[in-house]
Curated annotation (Swiss-Prot):
Molecular-function GO term, any one: water channel activity
Stored Gene3D superfamilies: Glycerol uptake facilitator protein
GO CC terms: apical plasma membrane; cytoplasmic vesicle membrane; plasma membrane
Similarity-based family: Belongs to the MIP/aquaporin (TC 1.A.8) family.
Sequence intervals crossing the membrane: 13-33, 40-60, 88-108, 127-147, 159-179, 204-224
This protein's name: Aquaporin-5
Residues carrying covalently attached carbohydrate according to the record: N124, N125
Database matches in InterPro entries: Aquaporin-like, Aquaporin_5, Aquaporin_transptr, MIP, MIP_CS
Residue span of motif NPA 2: 185-187
This protein's domain notes: Aquaporins contain two tandem repeats each containing three membrane-spanning domains and a pore-forming loop with the signature motif Asn-Pro-Ala (NPA).
Pfam families, per the entry: MIP (PF00230)
Keywords, sorted A to Z: Cell membrane, Cytoplasmic vesicle, Glycoprotein, Membrane, Repeat, Transmembrane, Transmembrane helix, Transport
Amino acid sequence: MKKEVCSAAFLKAVFAEFLATLIFVFFGLGSALKWPSAMPSVLQISLAFGLAIGTMAQALGPVSGGHMNPAITLALLVGNQISLLRAVFYLVAQLVGAIAGAAILYGLAPYNARSNLAVNALNNNTTAGQAVVAEMILTFQLALCVFSSTDSRRTSPVGSPALSIGLSVTLGHLVGIYFTGCSMNPARSFGPAVIMSRFSSAHWVFWVGPIVGAATAAIIYFYLLFPHSLSLSDRVAILKGTYEPDEDWEESQEERKKTMELTAH
């Protein structure tokens, strides 16, 4: 566990999560600014969030996995895909990155366009219960897309994971904006809420909904649909950060990379 945390690769991954989340939040929230001469549309905001997540997943995904989302990180922990310490460090990096991205946007945007900095809220008479279920469903489909498109066990061509994930985020926003402004990501909700000091009584919705939705997707995907044939000791080693994959796993990783490179050209 200590070896993992002290490695250069681990530190780079944590920084990549911070940077990717910062950029994602900056561009996502920036698309929702209410400029007097050009009010944002639902399509514009949806595409911006999708393009931002897809771009960062493509750019920094090879370094950290490109989570940029506490719900996804916790779901991967539930699915026994990452170590406990990695999850903790990623969560901190994501939350700090989200605050930094929102802070930069707040400093750049003029007062008349800044408004509430796109803080998530319950819209159109949506109740807290309805909002939680909506966020669960929205994040559930995102998490399934992430798990499937990045599964190293898949040998058939899967196209671009970054594109798939970007489209999944766009899809979620096209529906979710009408309910909650669409979170699907506790960091995205937390960052602007901190900068604007606007924690509503329903802020918990944007944590519970996405986390439960993503965790449910992890249980279904990693334990029911496509379970890993790992021993208990291997699962504990993954959780501790001491697991070392065998050569067959590494070879399958290389084959998948070659497949993805071919489909990208």
